[in-house]
Curated annotation (Swiss-Prot):
Disulfide bonds: none annotated. This is Glutamine synthetase leaf isozyme, chloroplastic. Residues 1-49 form a transit peptide. One of its GO terms (cellular component) is chloroplast. It comes from Pisum sativum. The gene is GS2. Residues 99-119 are annotated as: Disordered. The lineage of its organism: Eukaryota, Viridiplantae, Streptophyta, Embryophyta, Tracheophyta. One of its GO terms (molecular function) is ATP binding. It comes from the Eukaryota.
Length: 430
């Protein structure tokens, strides 16, 4: 016997008053029942808890309601407001009804939440205001329902400390930055953990699989763990309108990567945060824990990064390789500033091993995955293209990283003396 949500009396077409148990409603009957509702009835229909028996035992109708598409029966939509929590890496969300479909964030009303419950405001002044900034189709509810990526402000309109989008938007709206149309391609790595033991998916509990080597981009039950989650996430992002461009299994078993981009300016951060939220929801449903820890397992195992590919209009045009080298020079001079902004716990990952450079030293190279900045062979050959910043950790804030790259390469200028010394140090001719 199970308690389920069932239509009120006028909708119980196959339930008799004399029967001690409700007649089971099949999936076909349930669909027929729903399709017969008019908009008027859909608004007024009440649901109550009832018990249902079946020949096979208990039937749980919650799934039927979860899959119920409300779009044919109402103009109202459900908007899931998403924001970044107090740790700066956690995602929070809550839902509200909006009276009609929307096509732009400006049509979505501001909202608020209890910041004292997320570590973002004191209890005596706990209200934090959500400003809608980007909308995506909701892959979980379907129809006209939406996901709304927001940033957070005090009631006075000041961005709260964890709102990194506000500063990023200022940088991306600078005329010098706008003129260069910065592109970003972000490679988000993540690790899947078994729920109760917090140990990587596919690993023996308390033990280790065979050494790294056979797992990268592999197929097979003994080499690939979590493909269903990766693929579900891929399709959900495409449905949502996120600019996801690919996915692959990573070097460490139980670790995966997806790529978002190329995206222009602030859009890169919006799309990464929306994709992270969707991934959290999918792992929630799958009963698997998601971690963005940059080094989830100590020892001879790869860490998890968020490599960020970056180019400007000048880099993509003829002669762009010289512009790229000048950008690399600027990045070398601001290495410490970037490292401090590139994610928590990154020192455990950037050791100079496992396809990383040392956190303390800046380096660059062509096709060298052991450098801070990698330039592809095609970029060198064509004399134009992009650079890859391999320093960001998997838990980095994409608003911070993308904006800092633009600031360091387009808005910040070193002294001639510092530039000359840096060029000599990293063997870079500009």
């Amino acid at each position: 016997m199970a308690q389920i949500l069932a239509p009120s009396t006028q909708w119980q077409m196959r339930i008799t008053k004399t029967s001690p148990c409700a007649t089971p409603i099949t999936s076909k009957m349930w669909s027929s029942l729903v399709m017969k509702q008019t908009k008027k009835v859909a608004h007024s229909a009440k649901f109550r808890v009832m018990a249902v028996n079946s020949e096979n035992g208990t039937i749980n109708r919650v799934e039927d309601l979860l899959n119920l598409d409300i779009t044919p029966f109402t103009d109202s939509i459900i908007a899931e407001y998403i924001w970044i929590g107090g740790t700066g890496i956690d995602v929070r969300s809550k839902s509200r009804t909006i009276s009609k479909p929307v096509s732009h964030p400006s049509e979505v009303p501001k909202w608020n939440y209890d910041g004292s419950s997320t570590g973002q405001a004191p209890g005596e002044d706990s209200e934090v205001i959500l400003y809608p900034q980007a909308i995506f189709k909701d892959p979980f509810r379907g129809g006209n329902n939406i996901l709304v990526v927001c940033d957070a402000y005090t009631p006075a309109g000041e961005p709260i400390p964890t709102n990194k989008r506000h500063r990023a938007a200022e940088i991306f709206s600078n005329p010098k930055v706008e003129a260069e149309i910065p592109w970003y391609g972000i490679e988000q790595e993540y690790t899947l953990l078994q729920t109760n033991v917090k140990w990587p998916l596919g690993w023996p509990v308390g033990g280790y699989p065979g050494p790294q080597g056979p797992y990268y981009c592999a197929a097979g039950a003994d080499k690939s763990f979590g493909r269903d989650i990766s693929d579900a996430h891929y399709k959900a992002c495409i449905y949502a309108g996120i600019n996801i461009s690919g996915t692959n299994g990573e070097v460490m078993p139980g670790q995966w990567e997806y790529q978002v981009g190329p995206s222009v300016g602030i859009e890169a951060g919006d799309h990464i945060w929306a994709s992270r939220y969707i991934l959290e929801r999918i792992t929630e449903q799958a009963g698997v824990v998601l971690t963005l820890d940059p080094k989830p397992i100590e020892g001879d195992w790869n860490g998890a990064g968020c490599h960020t590919n970056y180019s400007t209009k000048s880099m993509r045009e003829d002669g762009g390789f010289e512009v790229i080298k000048k950008a690399i020079l600027n990045l070398s001079l601001r290495h410490k500033i970037h490292i401090e902004a590139y994610g928590e716990g990154n020192e455990r990952r950037l050791t100079g091993k496992h396809e990383t450079a040392s956190i303390n030293d800046f380096s660059w190279g062509v096709a060298n995955r052991g450098c801070s900045i990698r330039v592809g062979r095609d970029t060198e050959k064509n004399g134009k293209g992009y650079l890859e910043d391999r320093r960001p950790a998997s838990n980095m804030d994409p608003y911070v990283v993308t904006a800092l790259l633009a600031e360091s390469t387009l808005l910040w200028e070193p002294t001639l003396e510092a530039e000359a010394l840096a060029a000599q140090k990293i063997a870079l001719k500009v």
